Amino acid sequence: MKLTVILLMGSRDLTEPGVVAGTLADIAFNIAEGPVIVRHGACPGANSADQNASDWINSIGNRHGVLEDPMPADWDNCAPNCPPPDGHRRIKRPGDTAHPGLLPDYCPGAGPRRNAAMVAKQPRPEYGIAFPEPGQPNYGTRNCTRLAEAAGIPVKQITP
């Protein structure tokens, strides 16, 4: 049986988040020839592509050989190559759930660093699935898509 690693990237604010579960079910039940690992950025939120993938995997997928490999960004810490903190770190807005962490501010480079780590981690993803939300900036989704494609990982865009 062949292991399939999928790199999942997507909006935190999908208007039709059910498309994520439907896509993963199609891959698991109709395309994959063995166990599936879904690597995602663990972005929280009811309409997040990552959260919807995690919810489906933990409710149905894991009974059918689908596992998740969540890789949350470390929003609290800067990397050694980040600019000095003054002016670099951003203050969280009230109710900010997109940048979970303990501090009142966050490193804006944490998401791109996490995306690069998801692309580079072994076993290497066979392909990526991107769930951008039409009309939204989708910064993280676009960043991860570019990194994956630059690494030779084909990415399929799925929009409702």
Residue map of PLM features:
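Acidic/glycine-enriched connector segments
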Residues: 2-4, 14-160
